[in-house]
Amino acid sequence: MAEVLLFEALRDALDEEMQRDPSVLVMGEDVGHYGGSYKVTKGFHEKYGDLRLLDTPIAENSFTGMAIGAAMTGLRPIVEGMNMGFLLLAFNQIANNAGMLHYTSGGNFKIPIVIRGPGGVGRQLGAEHSQRLESYFQSVPGLQMVACSTPYNGKGLLKSAIRNDNPVIFFEHVLLYNLNENLIEQEYLLCLEKAEVVRPGNDITILTYSRMRHHVLQAAKVLVNKGYDPEIIDILSLKPLDMGTISLSVRKTHKVLIVEECMRTGGIGASLRAAILEDLFDYLDAPIQCLSSQDVPTPYSGPLEELTVIQPNQIIQAVEEMCKIE
């Protein structure tokens, strides 16, 4: 066992897969000589050279298209967005090409590409650099979406994403890179389509992902001391949703609280709520509650920035109110 930070776990995943498979390469702004904006590829340029660590111009649409073309020829490119918000400039490439080329080519082309990088609210990065793109990409056919939340699942999910023959959008939260955890030294992979039951419980199901997993766990400490028994599920796979794991929990607790950093309108929470109501309505004893970020641009001010996202005290209050419903 060794203590590893999240960005180090992601680096280890990339390093192991690049050693294992010479078709794996990384491209993006400052991923080579500089080692990436959050040092996830630090030292890789010296180890793997210019052909497998491609420093690109500031042209997201162009280098994402280049990566998709490389994937069509049999390579396994990993695109790093310096900030996930910048990938809006490559939306056409991701949606119309990465997501659909396998279908529109009649199955002749696989698109084994991973698009990863930092996003979310934090570090006072301002409105343009605090985007949550999961709401944008969830409706694009052909894309898988994963959000890591710990060094353990970050490493295991990224390795699986690289080996996957489908395009995967891999979300990393800017505030979680220095999160530490003891990891086993043996190689492991995690299923891209499986949620994690973080804490078993009987009173209420709390569905969450990414940074909000940790806000929920903070709230859970208080709730347990007050006598509540929440079941916490990190959904991990944003698309497709692991409705099997979610269904088992809802049938047991009969109450659902969704906690996300995504916007309330059109977010992952809205999709989760719709899926649960469609399949599990008869098992619910209370309306589904969804705690989401406000539908406003993220302020630069630190205190105002925090006010736009859900905090642990709001989770505690929501659980207490829902558990009063018989």
Swiss-Prot record:
Root EC class: oxidoreductase
Alphabetical list of Gene3D superfamilies matching this protein: 3.40.50.920, 3.40.50.970
Keywords: Chloroplast, Metal-binding, Oxidoreductase, Plastid, Potassium, Pyruvate, Thiamine pyrophosphate
Catalysed conversion reaction: N(6)-[(R)-lipoyl]-L-lysyl-[protein] + pyruvate + H(+) = N(6)-[(R)-S(8)-acetyldihydrolipoyl]-L-lysyl-[protein] + CO2
Cross-referenced Pfam families: Transket_pyr, Transketolase_C
GO molecular function, a single term: metal ion binding
Main subcellular location: plastid
A Gene Ontology term for the protein's cellular component: chloroplast
Entry cofactors: thiamine diphosphate
Protein residues bound to thiamine diphosphate: 60
Binding site for K(+): 113, 161-162, 166
EC number: 1.2.4.1
Localisation per UniProt entry: Plastid, Chloroplast
Assembly mode: Heterodimer of an alpha and a beta chain.
UniProt function note: The pyruvate dehydrogenase complex catalyzes the overall conversion of pyruvate to acetyl-CoA and CO(2). It contains multiple copies of three enzymatic components: pyruvate dehydrogenase (E1), dihydrolipoamide acetyltransferase (E2) and lipoamide dehydrogenase (E3).
Protein name listed in UniProt: Pyruvate dehydrogenase E1 component subunit beta
Originating species: Chaetosphaeridium globosum (Charophycean green alga)
Gene that encodes it: pdhB
